[in-house]
Amino acid sequence: AADYFMYTCYPADGDYLPSLYFGDSNIAANGEGVLKLLWTLGFQKTDMLWYLTQVRKNQAKESMPTDTPMGLLYTPDLSAAPMQPSLSLSVVYERMGWSMMRTSWEKNTTLLGVKCGHTWNHSHADAGSFILFHNGQQVIKDGGNCWYPNPWYREYFFHSQAHNVLLFNGQAQPQEQQYK
């Protein structure tokens, strides 16, 4: 679980630690609370300390800063944090259909996230969409995000055209869910 948060983050200069998201969260969402709880429960990897040093204070509602009771109790000693994690530069999460590739774990490098696999259940027709970070910026974003009651949700954001998906001969992915 901890590796997922590290692989989806984009170390960069700025006010928050950006993360990959495909219209289902927000760019500042992070796993700070999850990693601190895992650490406290004994699931400890030094790479987790690196991640915790990258998260900015109060960057998201999931945060657990040290000036709160939970943060004070669950924040590990970060002095042993490595300069960079020992994780590989790429990973594929086959079961969820996500892949991440990066040039380095240093700040402001390049990160490509690709969403692939089936479009089913609660998904959009966005298999094959991608997000690109480069030189500290999100260069290619996923445009498919709006509130469910908004009429544009079904009329536009649910469809391939709202995402970074390649169309073949002008054809997009089927709009119907594969599994209802």
Sequence positions of predicted segments:
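Active-site rim segments in enzyme catalytic domains, especially the processed small/beta chain
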Residues: 125-180
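Carbohydrate-active enzyme catalytic cores, enriched for enzymes
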Residues: 1-139
